[in-house]
């Protein structure tokens, strides 16, 4: 479901669409102590680049990135959104949820205990240990150890 149409020349693609279902809880990494090469920039729309960095890291394994790449079998080049991309999704939630439901998908949750999702953005200064969780219930962010398991909601970039 399309949730953002890009108006900026400095951002890749024509917009973003969100996947209809969550990815079951997975850890960002199977161990801590390794910066996985993702951005720590909270304003960057770089989830695609970050997801490739997670997938390509050889010093540790990313169960989360592996699950996202499993989606590629169906011809969708999905990735884990960055913090900035999650902010856009959160802002559009009221508009996209009814469409997600009509398509048979799982709406983005509001419940406090059920609304936290991984982003692909690592925590600045703590890249070896933490990444950001994002609440689709409130728009809040939480520094989280990479070895914890949480859900993700993949997105894709729309191109010409």
Indicate where each model-derived feature is located.
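Extracellular adhesion/carbohydrate-recognition regions
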Residues: 1-78, 115-116, 127, 145-156, ...
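An exposed tryptophan-centered "aromatic clamp" motif
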Residues: 54-78, 83-136
């Amino acid at each position: 479901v399309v949730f953002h149409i890009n108006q900026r020349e400095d951002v890749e693609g024509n917009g973003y669409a969100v996947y209809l279902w969550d990815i079951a809880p997975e850890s960002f990494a199977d161990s801590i102590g390794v910066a996985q090469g993702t951005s720590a920039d909270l304003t960057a729309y770089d989830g695609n680049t970050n997801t490739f960095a997670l997938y390509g890291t050889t010093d540790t394994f990313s169960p989360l990135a592996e699950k996202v790449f499993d989606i590629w079998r169906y011809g969708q080049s999905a990735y884990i959104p960055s913090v900035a991309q999650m902010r856009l999704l959160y802002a559009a939630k009221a508009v996209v949820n009814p469409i997600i439901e009509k398509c048979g998908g799982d709406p983005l949750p509001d419940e406090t205990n059920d609304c936290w999702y991984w982003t692909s953005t690592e925590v600045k200064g703590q890249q070896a240990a933490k990444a950001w969780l994002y609440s689709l219930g409130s728009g809040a962010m939480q520094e989280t150890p990479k070895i914890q398991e949480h859900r993700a909601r993949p997105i894709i970039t729309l191109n010409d």
